[in-house]
Amino acid sequence: MAEYCTYEKYVFKKQLETLKSKNGRSTELISLYIPPDKQISDVTKHLREEHEQASNIISKLIRNNVQEALHSLLAKLRSLHKIPENGIVYFTGTVDTGANRTGMVNEVLFPPEPVADYIYRCDSVFYLEPLEEMLRECTTYGLLLLDLREATIGMLVGRQTEVIKHLHSTVPGKQRKGGQSAHRFEQLRRIAIHDFYKRIGDATSEAFLELDPAELKGILIGGHSPTKEEFNEGGFLHYELQKKVLGLFDTGYTDESGFSELINAAEETLQSIDLLKQKKDMEIFFKEIATESGKISYGEDNVRANLEIKAVDVLLLSEELRAERVTLKCRVCGYENKRTRKWKTGEAVPAIGHCPECDSELEVTDVIDTVGELSELADKGDARIAFISTDFDEGSQLMIAFGGIAAILRYNTGV
């Protein structure tokens, strides 16, 4: 099966790429972000106010375009009975389609994570930054912040952080009270520190051991030095969780506000972990090529054939692959054919061309997303789907040398 969010992320990324390529001739493209807790009546009221204000736009063309977009949004809201769990995002407006022509865009996106803020923006481009932030891997990491005063345990799921538990310590400060020897005071202080570390370890273990081991990708520990190092080296975490510690990071805060600081400090570590998984898949692929085991396949037709007989263990797809299977028909002579057209992110979709029989223009009668089709076949055959970045050599080779589509097989099929 595909890893959580893998194919959904690909589809979502494609939608954003399409919207990013659209431009208005003026500030007439509307982006509307509605959080799950927003009242539809409040949004409707706001859009009516915007419609009234738009009547003051000097340019008749821009005024009509903006008001038409607002009419479209109001019509959609009338048919919306409830805001979805993660909120909803609308993009609408008149875009430049080239050759001095324009067209209307009406797109609705259901975000993979909750929309945080209500946003209404009218500009010459669509406002996509909040959705682009959601493209981060939908994985779960444990978070732990600690110093000798407090500890905060939480989780990072996608880009959302959640506090699980907050602990306060009874560790005394470094200034001893009168009547105590320095040695006795330090001894009692070390006992209090040890007890606090144990409380942190027990609470962290209780929180994270409840999760599916495959779901928890790792644990990030932040705080002051040498406190976090002492805790990590002291064996206070359950041994299964200790193996998942990805690194220790300096943070100024150890309450909930320190989570974003910890995540930013660990950014390179988190990125490298995802790339390591991808590199491992590609290493296996190239190893099978080198040993001539026959347990690999590449090229759309061969991979499709192996998927259909459920022989694929891992389906390898380049993140940069954009491909569609199109059915072409000539209305003049009746010629019909199916063809896959490919392009890279940021490139224009290739033109269809002319009929090879009579040189008339071909018409597209059906379009199927190649990645979606192959992913469905992979799911039916219980194959894992791995989207491979081009940010490392082997990932680039998958796109350049193998057309962005390959597979590791369960056995040699001869295909």
UniProtKB/Swiss-Prot annotation:
It comes from the Archaea. Signal peptide: none annotated. Keywords: Cytoplasm, Protein biosynthesis. GO terms for cellular component: cytosol; translation release factor complex. InterPro entries: eFR1_2_sf, eRF1_1_Pelota, eRF1_1_sf, eRF1_2, eRF1_3, Peptide_chain-rel_aRF1, Peptide_chain-rel_eRF1/aRF1, Ribosomal_eL30-like_sf. The keyword RNA-binding does not apply. Gene3D superfamilies: 1.20.5.170, 3.30.1330.30, eRF1 domain 1, eRF1 domain 2. It is found in: Cytoplasm. GO terms for molecular function: sequence-specific mRNA binding; translation release factor activity, codon specific. Pfam families: eRF1_1, eRF1_2, eRF1_3. Heterodimer of two subunits, one of which binds GTP. NCBIfam families: aRF1_eRF1. Belongs to the eukaryotic release factor 1 family. Directs the termination of nascent peptide synthesis (translation) in response to the termination codons UAA, UAG and UGA. This is Peptide chain release factor subunit 1-2. The lineage of its organism: Archaea, Methanobacteriati, Methanobacteriota, Stenosarchaea group, Methanomicrobia.
